[in-house]
Amino acid sequence: MEEINKYIQNSSETGGEIYNLIEELFPICRSITGNGVRKTMDIIRKHIPLEIHEVKSGTKVFDWTVPKEWNIKDAYVRNSKGEKVIDFKENNLHVMSYSVPVHKTMTLDELKPYLHTIPGNKDRIPYLTSYYKENWGFSLTQNKFDELCDDDYEVVIDSSLEDGSLTYGEYYIRGELEEEILLTTYTCHPSMCNDNLSGVALITFIAKALSKLKTKYSYRFLFAPETIGSITWLSRNEDKLKNIKMGLVATCVGDAGIKNYKRTKFGDAEIDKIVEKVLMHCGSEYYVADFFPWGSDERQFSSPGINLPVGSLMRSCYGFDGYHTSADNLCYMNKDGLADSYKTYLEVIYTIENNRTYLNLNPKCEPQLGKRGIYRMIGGGSDYPFDEFAMFWVLNMSDGKNSLLDIAYKSGMEFRRIKYAADALYRVELLKLV
C-alpha cells in the first residue's frame, strides 16, 4: 500500500484543508440530535458519500432510550432598555444544550440560578448540557455576569423538544478482506474546535484519502453523537462486530500539543502496538496512557459485552486548558498540528495494512544475498538503501509466527525499515506469506 505515501507527503497541505472544514462547521449549533447534526452531515457529504441513519425517539438501545429531538432557533436575555445582554446568535454556547422552551420576565435574583459562569476564567463561556433531565439555562463569561444590574429581564429560549430522531452517518470502504478497521468520531458538540470538530474533520479527510486506495482491510467510518450515538450504533449493528479487527476514536487532534495515545482496555492489542511503534519513531514528544473507563466512545466499544480493541489517538487530551469552554475556538486550532495528526493516522493505517507474517524459505543458516542481486532490489528508495541488518532480522525471525511488527519491536527498528527489507527478500523468493 505504498500509494498512501503521497497523502502522507502532502499532509502539510491537507492540514490547511482540514482547518477549512473545521471553519465551515464551527458556527453550527450541534447537539446529540437535531438539525445542526444533519447540517453537519450534509457538509461532510461534500467530501465523502456518508450514509445517513435516523433512529426514532423512544427506541430502546441496550439500557438506554433514544431521547427526544432538540432544536433551537434563538435565545436571549434582554434588559429593560431592550439590550440583549446574552445572545445565542453571538455564541451558541450561551444556551445550555437541550434547554426547554422559555419565555418569561424575571428579576436578576430570579434569573441567577439559571446563569452559569467560570469564576476562575472570567472571559470564558462554559459548555453545559442537560440531555436527560428537562432543564434550561444560560452560560456567560464571569465578566459579563458581573456587569448585570438589578433589573427586569426578558428571558427567551425559542427551542423545541419533541419526538423526532437521532442522526448518525457512516461510510464503509470494502477492502480485500471482510475484516474491518473502525475509525469513529463524535458530532454532538456545538461551536468548539479541538473537542471535537478536529476529529470530525480529520476522519473525513482520512476517509477521503482511503477511498482512492486499494486496501487490504475494509474500513468503517462512524460519525455519531457521543455516548448515545455509539450505543445506538452498537445496538443496531451487533452482527457487524465480529468483523471489527481494531479501531480508534478520533478526538482532540487539532491543537499544537504533543500526541497522546490512550490504550485499549487490553493494553497490548495489535492496535496498541501499532500506534506505539509509530509514535516511537515520529520524531517528536508523545505520551501513552493506560485505559481508563471514561473519556470518549472507546468506553462503549470496550464494554464487557462488546469488548473490541479500540483506543484513542489524540493531541492534547480532554481536560486541556479551554476544554468545554468558548476558548476552544478557531484560534486554538493549529494547522501544523492538524497536518501532523493526519500524517500520524495515515502512518498507523500504513502499518496496519502492511503488518504481515512471513516464513523463511531458506532457514538453514543465512542465505547468500549477493548472488541474488538483492542490494539492487530494496524497495525503500534513498531513505532505505541496502540494509543488511534489517534483512538479517527479517530472515532470522520469519518463522511463520513473528509478524513484521513483532520483528520491528525486537530489532528496535522503524516498521518501514523492516517492511522494505521483507519486500526485497520476498521478491527473490526467500520468504513466503503465511
From Swiss-Prot:
GO molecular function, one term: metal ion binding
Permutated winged helix-turn-helix: annotated segments: 356-434
Pfam families, per the entry: DUF2172 (PF09940), DUF4910 (PF16254), HTH_47 (PF16221)
CDD domains found in the cross-reference section: M28_like (cd05644)
Annotated TM spans: none
Required cofactor(s): Zn(2+)
Protein's UniProt keywords contain Thylakoid: no
Annotated region described as Aminopeptidase-like, given as residue ranges: 1-55, 57-355
Cofactor notes: Binds 1 zinc ion per subunit.
Residues the record lists as binding Zn(2+): 189, 195, 324
Annotated spans, Insert: 56-164
UniProtKB keywords: Carbohydrate metabolism, Metal-binding, Zinc
SUPFAM superfamilies to which the protein is assigned, alphabetical: Zn-dependent exopeptidases (SSF53187)
Subunit and interaction comment: Homotrimer.
Record note on domains: Contains an N-terminal region with low similarity to aminopeptidases, an insert domain, and a C-terminal permutated winged helix-turn-helix domain.
Function (record text): The genomic context suggests a role in the biosynthesis of modified polysaccharides; this association with genes involved in carbohydrate metabolism is observed in several phylogenetically distinct taxa. Is not expected to have peptidase activity despite low similarity to aminopeptidases.
Stated family: Belongs to the UPF0770 family.
The protein's name: Putative polysaccharide biosynthesis protein with aminopeptidase-like domain
